[in-house]
């Protein structure tokens, strides 16, 4: 499961954080990406911005089995640039 949020200024932030905690407690694989840019994130940026890249990487990974930088590799491990970027909050549980 994937949750992408627009940070504390996002109206959905508290619910998304709570959903992450509850789903993770069930042992269901889950990722959360959040950047403080508000509800809707940067989806209206050229080509959908980072939010669209994250969404597409998740779909590529789970629907196409893509483990490269256009799939799982963008979201976890050494290829995850969001994971080391201080502008992003990234959490994961039970991801393999």
Predicted regions and their residues:
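Active-site-adjacent alpha-helix of alpha/beta-hydrolase-fold enzymes
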Residues: 1-66
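Catalytic active-site module of serine/aspartate enzymes centered on a nucleophile-bearing elbow/loop
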Residues: 48-96
């Amino acid at each position: 499961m994937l949750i992408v949020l627009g940070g504390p200024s996002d109206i959905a932030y508290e619910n998304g954080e709570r959903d992450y905690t509850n789903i993770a407690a069930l042992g269901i694989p889950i990722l959360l990406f959040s950047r403080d840019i508000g509800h809707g994130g940067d989806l209206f940026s050229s080509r959908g911005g980072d939010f669209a890249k994250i969404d597409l990487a998740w779909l590529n990974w789970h629907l196409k089995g893509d483990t490269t930088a256009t799939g799982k590799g963008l979201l976890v491990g050494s290829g995850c640039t969001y994971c080391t970027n201080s502008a992003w909050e990234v959490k994961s549980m039970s991801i393999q």
